[in-house]
Amino acid sequence: MAGEFYDSARIFVQAGDGGDGAATFRREKYVPRGGPDGGDGGRGGHVYLVADPGLNTLLPFRERTRFIAERGGNGGRSRKHGRNGRDVFIRVPVGTVARTVIDGETYSVDLDAPGLRLLAARGGRGGLGNVHFATSSYQVPRIAELGEPGERREIELELKLLADVGLIGFPNAGKSTLLSVISAARPKIAPYPFTTLQPNLGVVEVGEYSFVVADIPGLIEGAHRGVGLGFSFLRHIERTRLLIHIIDAAGVDGRDPVNDFSAINEELRLYQPALAQRPQVVALNKADLPEAQANLKRLRAAIPVSEQDLFVISAATREGVDALLQRVAERLREMPAPHRAPRDETLTWPVPEVDERLYTIERTGDGWRVRGRRIERLISMTNFAQPDAIMRIQRVLEASGIGAALQEAGIQNGDVLYIEQAAFDWEDGAITYRMPGVS
């Protein structure tokens, strides 16, 4: 993997507001009282995340973190429909997990196939023009809707590598050296722990068979709690099909190789029990050192893997490396290949469907607050400067049963009714709009 790796980011996305509907009337020479002809506003632009196989890092989001879509155009005379706002497409690497909080709950979507799209923020609906409000008894509607506000989201992005094989082991066990000799990858290599601070990918070819190997940053005890490079390490092996567990058989850092094997598997189990069951091939590395040769008999007896999955190697001299790769290729062929074919599909946040007609009423310090998707959307799309706006809200309160429910709850004359950002004075079942700043 060339360049700098960046595997998490936080962005803000804002979909476009819908355009306003028009409250206009026909003006014809011989029709002095023409009917309503106001057109609808256009939809606000959506914001999408798109899985792009050509990307491998979230680094661009270090520089740019805000994405705002275009507002829809306003409606016009002669039923002219406003133009829809342009959508925004944000490209992310395949394997990116997006998370956001909606109504206090966290939802996530996994963009694990090329071409997958996530509708991250939905553009607002265009406001209706006054042609929609004309009836036989209301032939001159002086009302049109404002555009619905577009959705706004704070989104956390996390990249989980899509590799077939993960190289795991304590820092300085030789993972980067092994990757450099089995592939064209050139990770930073040095004789001290934590040389690898970011994942590296390499493509390995065994005959006509090839697979992707990820050299993951080294693990230490407590990684499942985020100690050291813990989370950076563990999240990237979740998608691998097989692990090569590299052990410093020479114990050059003063640790016991058997304890190393047990400690890393325990960290896998504590982070995610399924990871501890992931197939492993064990490589006893640094066999070119005398200390390793002295430990081999004990290690073979103590490490609980089958003989065919235990290899003595030297990444520095390539001793035993070819046999190791043959076995890895053999194991991978036996496993079902992951389905990563392109998918032309649009996903949405997995929010449970809620009946928009539902509402709640609660007592506040000086009045009452009504909450509900449909009634709150109506308020947000109401232009209170229009003469007939309050009349429409009054009708909706009565038809929906909210007015009766408020009276049953105990609302009194003079109480204040709050819906969305608007406030109304209540008097004998009728509402009067409170101008902002007026008490």
Swiss-Prot record:
Binding site for Mg(2+): 176, 196
Disulfide bridge partners, by residue number: none
One GO molecular-function entry: magnesium ion binding
EC number: 3.6.5.-
Domain (OBG-type G): residue spans on this chain: 163-333
Residue intervals of the OCT domain: 351-428
InterPro entries in the record: G_OBG (IPR031167), GTP-bd (IPR006073), GTP-bd_Obg/CgtA (IPR014100), GTP-bd_prot_GTP1/OBG_C_sf (IPR036346), GTP1-OBG_CS (IPR006074), GTP1_OBG_dom (IPR006169), GTP1_OBG_dom_sf (IPR036726), OBG_GTPase (IPR045086)
One Pfam family named in its UniProt record: MMR_HSR1
Quaternary organization: Monomer.
Family: Belongs to the TRAFAC class OBG-HflX-like GTPase superfamily. OBG GTPase family.
The name this protein goes by in its record: GTPase Obg
Species of the source: Roseiflexus castenholzii (strain DSM 13941 / HLO8)
Gene this protein is translated from: obg
